[in-house]
């Protein structure tokens, strides 16, 4: 069993549970990017279309895929539902969530056309999801950079998401050295890009949060 894969999945699962717990128990959505959460829902829906073929690698793999689709969609529903339960917070969230995601969608679509394993619908959808996931956090980071401060649980959520992607780099190295000696270059370089996007956040998280100072991204 690949320990880095398990740790990465646990970190990802933890990040989602942190966010759901935050929204459900406090109804506090300030600092959360609705656009990033919508992109993540799109990422997992397009990535795991192979569930419809019923060619599952393992029960664990299938259950994790279903969880990520359902949970990310549920987060979007919770955020959208705040329009009715907390109208002021919902409007403020949208007002600050101004990153133009059409650039990310078009860029990911183009990358999937140029970089894919096979020119089939499922493979193109998978490649699109990988490239989109690598940049889906940008609206959230952009929102934080504009606002400067945010709720600590949101910061911990972003850290857990970044850790999940960072752990997938040693996961690919482990698989290359112990399995078939084949490196999935699309997943590797997209994951590397995503980890680099988190690098500034990781540094500030360590210097400000871990060391007990207030969190604030540079504008």
Swiss-Prot record:
Signal peptide: none
Single GO BP term: protein transport
Matching InterPro entries: ER_ret_rcpt
Ranges that cross the membrane: 6-26, 38-58, 59-79, 99-116, 119-139, 153-173, 186-206
Principal localisation: endoplasmic reticulum
One Gene Ontology cellular component annotation held by this UniProt entry: endoplasmic reticulum
Ranges in the topological domain labelled Lumenal: 1-5, 117-118, 174-185
Keywords: Endoplasmic reticulum, ER-Golgi transport, Membrane, Protein transport, Receptor, Transmembrane, Transmembrane helix, Transport
Location in the cell: Endoplasmic reticulum membrane
Molecular function in Gene Ontology: ER retention sequence binding; HDEL sequence binding
Top-rank taxon: Eukaryota
Membrane topology: Multi-pass membrane protein
Topology, Cytoplasmic side: 27-37, 80-98, 140-152, 207-219
Family named by the database record: Belongs to the ERD2 family.
Its job: Required for the retention of luminal endoplasmic reticulum proteins. Determines the specificity of the luminal ER protein retention system. Also required for normal vesicular traffic through the Golgi. This receptor strongly recognizes H-D-E-L and weakly recognizes D-D-E-L and K-D-E-L.
PANTHER family in the record: ER LUMEN PROTEIN RETAINING RECEPTOR (PTHR10585)
Protein name: ER lumen protein-retaining receptor
